[in-house]
Amino acid sequence: KTVEYTVETENVAEYIINVPEGWHADYADNTLAITAPAKDLCHFDKEGTVAITVVSESGKMAIVKVNVFAGEWVNEVELRILTFEDADCNGEEIGDGIYAWSEFIPTGGQYGNGHGSYWWGDYGNTEIEFTPVYGMYGAYGGHAGISNYVGSDWQNEGNFSFDLQAYNVTGGHSGTNFNTYFGYLDESGYGMMESLPPFYFWDGEARVIDHMWVTNTTYFYNQAHSAGFGSDYVISDESTFKIVAYGYESDDDTEPTVAEFYLLNVGQNFVTEWTKWDLSVLGKVTRVEFNCVGSDDMYGSYGMSVPGYFAYDDVAVQFPGETVFR
């Protein structure tokens, strides 16, 4: 970009203009034009000094300096993060009579105890809201719940009564709490619900979900090794299990964008720690639905023979930040 300055001169015999590398400057007809290097020429100096040495007709010399800086106005992105930590609650109701995330966590055993049947919202922060999906099994058709249960004894603590337990971690990704997800659809007719449990922006505004952190649950880790309900499934080096995210820009959107994350990859490679999942590839969305999909060997006469669970935390959403020149 070129910036022009009006400069009135008199009695100038000659002048020399020195510029930083990559810059250009010219003077003609009382106009000083300074041109910054192109944006893609980042190896040139972004800032420096244009020095103009002027010699008068009487032989006197003066140096005029102009400090220059090349940049652009940039709309920065603010990342707001849903942490599920009580310290980040703002005093507003986030559930039915609930004001802190830990109040959702059952203390009398993980399975049952009302989990899976409640709504929640991260109001005034990410604006993400969740309502349960009621399928053929009622509230247990989709969604598990807020949790702080963790463990690594997958052989003894890997059945359905430990369904809120994240595997092999010491807590949430950045704190104590996290969320657990349950839900899947398949073509067997024995899926747990008629639609997938989504979370969405309650105000209908389309936003970019930048990323979230995911890991396996102890329940899935156990069952992936030993499950066989309705099938002859035995884990092999070819077995896989993934989360598929579907992003919808509006309620009328019938062609969602898609992102995938493998919780179990070939070679019996399980995710056993909090791992970042880039969801920005979905673009701007008003809601996201998640499905759990196994490899063909995980399906039998009653559909998927392993539990469609995963744990997630620290959901980051992009919001407009400050406009800065840089």
Q: What residue ranges belong to the model's regions?
A:
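Terminal, low-complexity interaction segments
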Residues: 243-326
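Extracellular/luminal low-complexity segments enriched in Ser/Thr/Pro
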Residues: 31-49
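Extracellular ligand-binding interfaces
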Residues: 213-266
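Short, solvent-exposed loop/linker segments at beta-strand-coil boundaries, enriched for Pro/Gly
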Residues: 11-31, 212
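C-terminal edge beta-strand
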Residues: 58-73
